[in-house]
Amino acid sequence: MPPHARSGRGPKPQKNGRTEQRQQKRKRDQEDLQQLQQRVDELDLKSDATKKFSELPLSVPTAEGLEIAHFQTLTDVQARAVPLALKGKDILGAAKTGSGKTLAFLIPVLEKLYRAQWTEFDGLGALIISPTRELAAQIFEVLRKVGTKHSFSAGLVIGGKSLKEEAERLDRMNILVCTPGRMLQHFDQTAGFDANNLQILVLDEADRIMDMGFQSAVDALIEHLPRERQTLMFSATQSKKVSDLARLSLKDPEYVSVHEAAVSATPTNLQQHYIVTPLTEKLDTLYGFIKANLKSKIIVFLSSGKQVRFVYESFRHLQPGIPLLHLHGRQKQGARMEITSRFTAAKQTCLFATDVVARGIDFPAVDWVIQADCPEDVDTYIHRVGRTARYESNGRAVLFLDPSEEPGMLKKLELKKIPIQKVNVKEKKKKSIKDQLQSMCFQNPDLKYLGQKAFISYSRSIHLQRDKDVFKFNKLDLDGFAASLGLPGTPQVKFRKGEDIKKIKNAPRQGMSSGSESDEDGEKKTKKKEVRTKYDKMFERTNQDVLSSHYNKLVLDGDDNDDDEEDFLSVKRVLRDDDLDDEAGAYKSTAKIIDGLGGEEPFVVDSKRREKALKSKKKMLKFKGNSTKMVFDDDGNAHAVYELRDEDDFMGEGPAEEQRRKFVEDETSRVREADVDDKALAKQKRREKREKRKAAERAELMGIVSDGEDAPVLHNADDGEDPLALLRSLPMGDGSDSEGDREPPKKRAKKWFEDDSDEENKSKSKSKGKVIRVQEEPETLEDLEALATGLLD
């Protein structure tokens, strides 16, 4: 039997066989890559015969991923953009909403890294930037489906998640889908992370990323990327600005516009209408429209998040008969993702949203897109209505316009080849909800607060719009709009000059105050510090509700003096907060005021608690101020520890060189005097040490045992003491322990016939025979008297 059969091991030639198999597999992979590259090089860009993904020169993992995700037929933008991207060209892609732009850049990303044999050790190879978190999450999900057969590592980097967890995994990622702000934060803060090996950069919704709102973040982001890279830019409204292209370092980009020659810039199967409704009737029209379409899937776009919150809360109380959702940028990321998934899965629901979901988000089967607020430009309109009629499906869109906005907006839409028709609202469909909103605002202060916030945000958004041909702030009925929201009065809105709406819209959330909405021109004047008694505090006391200060800022009551006729009960005087302060200040306080404690404010004794505090040093410390350290000169004058003199006083004492010489002489003499004392002290210590050593040696010769620490020391005869007095006082024993160290004798045990009284009698008898030991023989009369006194006692 051969030896390898006993041990169970195979022959060595099998190991060589496995090595040969690996080499052959590596060789086949190299040949497949060469063939794939050859097919890409031979690809004819002018041919329009490519209709399916199987006809493109794609790798096996990509083809299998497309088949698993059920992608078979190419859209127009994919048929034109993918071949150019496979050849390494920079692309500017423009196509209608819902035309498949996401897949048009994901396939080139996977193929670029696959042909380069990219691994996790090569670092970041592809970067995909999206303007919103929801769109980035959607792109990442499509990437997971299409790239399921690839071995690349991909990550989603958006705000609202743990920065530390992202940083730990970032250096192992090959493909990143991100938002600009979060990615820039990682480039600036994450140690060891760079993009020096980046192969391809993708900008989805590029016109939104390149506008003024993201300009600073994108410019800083581009500085971290290498210049030698492939760049792909896609959007439904593409930018051709030379400055934008130069910022991204594009090299001879190919402009792909599939629907440039189309009759309309929006999908052909999209029905577009607009309704002219005054601002005061906007909510009534919106509520009636929702009530008439309860079996539909609806998206309602509003201009601000505060409007979204107010409309959602008020309609939720009205219960129109359809599930309601709301989505805006102020929500936490988890809530935003949950609402997005719920709306995607629902068949009959209404979503109130801002422009957070206006771009790129693919909501299936949306029936209606309602723009309750006029969009800021035509591009925003195109992206909003693009949430319906996705890829050859039908959809309908409605735009609400104020009579002042109608002429300018229609002219803008006509220039962009957008067909839109006017429709009128049926009278029987109209239903006023003004009284219901007013009742709800009266009963619910929080809803009233949201209404005031919504009014302010809408007024600011209209005032800050650049296109004054469409948005005419002075022609809006703001008083009627406030009444239609259910508010008792028109909130006061103040504006600042030179504001940029896009910069404000895209500003970091940390820079915005969530608790205050005031934009006052100047800071409030600080009142002069005065002595405030408990009566002053009583006059200044106001409502402690959380919204009370907000109401005082917004609502002005009593300013309207238009009515000349007096009512039966007329207001003769309106007390303001300032008037209350004056009344409180005019009150003559009888409180006792104590000055001179050292603090900045005097101490006011206006209660028994204050009088009691006078007796406590701890409580009075805060009224005494901070202590100061003073130094007294030879004349007894107090000076601070560190004093600064001006130049005139310094020069009055003589030239600087003479003062320096005098200072050196004084310090030298002071040091010499101190040196004499130091030498004498050192000499005395040496003498004491020497005498201590001699005394220890002498005691050792005499047989005295010492611990070494308290050795006897012989003093000088000059001290007036007997040098041998210390030696006489020492115990002269036989080397045993001293009496103090001996244990006291044990007490004798009691006999059976003894008790405590016997012990007391015995102690009394002992005390009668007291013996007084005399240390020395009395020599003087005083010694004899002291001895006699002791015997008498």
Curated annotation (Swiss-Prot):
Subcellular location(s) per record: Nucleus, Nucleolus
Xref: Pfam families: CTE_SPB4, DEAD, Helicase_C
Biased composition (Basic and acidic residues): 17-31, 657-681, 739-754
Ranges for domain Helicase C-terminal: 282-431
Ranges of residues in domain Helicase ATP-binding: 82-256
Motif (Q motif): 51-79
Residues covered by region (Disordered): 1-33, 497-535, 648-793
Biased composition (Basic residues): 682-693
Alphabetical list of PROSITE patterns matching this protein: DEAD_ATP_HELICASE, HELICASE_ATP_BIND_1, HELICASE_CTER, Q_MOTIF
GO MF entry, a single one: ATP binding
Reactions it catalyzes: ATP + H2O = ADP + phosphate + H(+)
Primary localisation category: nucleus
InterPro entries: DEAD/DEAH_box_helicase_dom, Helicase_ATP-bd, Helicase_C-like, P-loop_NTPase, RNA-helicase_DEAD-box_CS, SPB4-like_CTE
Motif (DEAD box): 204-207
E.C. numbers: 3.6.4.13
Alphabetic keyword roster: ATP-binding, Helicase, Hydrolase, Nucleotide-binding, Nucleus, Ribosome biogenesis, RNA-binding, rRNA processing
GO biological processes: rRNA processing
Binding positions (ATP): 95-102
UniProt entry tagged with the keyword DNA repair: no
Family listed: Belongs to the DEAD box helicase family. DDX10/DBP4 subfamily.
Assembly and interaction partners: Interacts with the U3 and U14 snoRNAs. Associates with pre-ribosomal complexes.
Cited function: ATP-dependent RNA helicase required for ribosome biogenesis. Involved in the release of U14 snoRNA in pre-ribosomal complexes. Required for pre-rRNA cleavage at site A2.
Entry domain remark: The Q motif is unique to and characteristic of the DEAD box family of RNA helicases and controls ATP binding and hydrolysis.
Protein name, as recorded: ATP-dependent RNA helicase DBP4
Lineage of producing organism: Eukaryota, Fungi, Dikarya, Ascomycota, Pezizomycotina
Name of the coding gene: DBP4
